[in-house]
Each structure stands twice: as C-alpha cells, then as structure tokens.
Curated annotation (Swiss-Prot):
Lineage: Bacteria, Pseudomonadati, Pseudomonadota, Alphaproteobacteria, Hyphomicrobiales
EC number: 2.1.1.77
HAMAP family named among the record's database cross-references: PIMT (MF_00090)
Protein name: Protein-L-isoaspartate O-methyltransferase
Single biological process term from Gene Ontology: protein modification process
Primary enzyme class: transferase
Keywords tagged on the record: Cytoplasm, Methyltransferase, S-adenosyl-L-methionine, Transferase
Encoding gene, per UniProt annotation: pcm
C-alpha cells in the first residue's frame, strides 16, 4: 500500500491547496492524511501528487486535489454528520469525507469501480464508509436522510428525489450543467423556509448518468 508522497512533494501539495484558498484546517489535515497515490493506477503514482485530474477505470476520472478540497470545504462538515456521495469513482473523495464525518454512504453505478474503491477504503481503515452499487438518481429507500450530499459527476439538474434525501439544515454540493460543456458548482441549502441555491465556481465533470452500468 502506498504511504503518500516524499516530504518535498507533500509540502508542495499542501502549499498549492493553501495558495488556492483552502483554509479549513480539518480539510487540509484530511487531504494530508489520505494518500492519493493509493487511489490511482500503479503507472500514475508519480503524478498522484500533482494538482490535476487523472483517468481511472471505466472511462472515469479522479478529480484534481484542489476540486476535492474545495467541494469538501464548501460542505461545512461536522463530525456528527451523515454524508451521501453520488459517484464513488476511485474512492478518494469518500476517504476524505470519512475523516470529517460520522458515516458515509457512497453510490457507484460501475461494479468495477465500486469493488476497487471498497478494497482501497478497507486497506486504509475507512470503516465508516459503505460502498454500494447503485443509481444516484434513485437513492435506495432504506438510506434515510443525510446532513450532507455531494455529487461528483455533472447533473443537468438536481432531481427533486435527491433533495428529498437532504435533512433540514442540510447542504448539497453538485456540478450542474450540460454534459458536453462547462458546468457550475452549486451549493444548495435546505431549511424550513425552503431551498437556497448559490453558484460557486465553474467546473468540468464527467456526466452523471441514470441507472447501473450494463458492463464493467
């Protein structure tokens, strides 16, 4: 199991996050503790500590570290929170979330990715993360409500069924927009008075697709 970058790369990794505005110490600590090289293909481990997205299996990507840190910071997580992640991918984002919350349920439509992520998370003792093969547009009925929801693939719009899974005072972070162009990262807060939406930054994510993958 990889153990993270050598000291110079580790220092530059943290410095790059701080320079780009990440200031939440808990988020920075989680980014420091989770070895990103454990979540990429063996031939890409030399690139794992660069601030860039990398390809993974099933035509998907592992997001660049700044985007992971930024989305996590915008969630305003607390240790008692229960989190839903739509799009497990490599499992890297779930590992970060596991350091900052009580429990994480992460859904992945590709069996290959779900199996790989489950093994990686187990190796890192992320025991509060449950990986399920599932459709992010149809969250399982037994899942209950969540304090925070994060979507790691682009939705053309956030479905009402997903907002229904958000508890009062909950926050949802998702890239929203067309699949073949730049999207907008949205932060949605649910309160007794209704739904509040805030546009954050422009992003580019792979598309979120309904249903389970027929292959892979």
């Amino acid at each position: 199991m990889p153990i993270g970058p050598p000291p110079p790369e580790k220092m530059m990794f943290q410095l790059s996050l701080r320079r780009r505005g990440i200031s939440d110490q808990a988020v920075l600590r989680a980014m420091d503790e989770v070895p990103r090289d454990a979540f990429v293909e063996p031939g890409q481990r030399a690139e794992a500590w660069l601030d860039t997205a990398l390809p993974i299996a099933c035509g998907q990507t592992i997001s660049q570290p700044f985007v992971v840190a930024y989305m996590t910071e915008q969630m305003q997580l607390r240790p008692e929170h229960r989190v839903l992640e739509i799009g497990t991918g490599s499992g890297y984002q779930a590992a970060i979330l596991s350091r900052l919350s009580r429990a994480v349920l992460t859904l992945e439509r590709f069996k290959t990715l779900a199996d790989q992520a489950r093994a990686r998370l187990a190796a890192l003792h992320c025991d509060n993360v449950e990986v399920r093969i599932g459709d992010g547009f149809a969250v399982p009925a037994d899942a209950g409500l969540f304090d925070r929801i994060i979507v790691t693939a682009a939705m053309e719009e956030v479905p009402a069924s997903l907002l229904d899974r958000l508890d009062l005072d909950g926050v949802l972070i998702a890239p929203v927009g067309p699949h073949n162009a730049t999207q907008t990262l949205l932060r949605i807060r649910k309160s007794k008075s209704g739904i509040e939406r805030k546009e954050l930054v422009a992003v580019r994510f792979v598309p979120a697709l309904p249903g389970l993958a027929r292959e892979l």
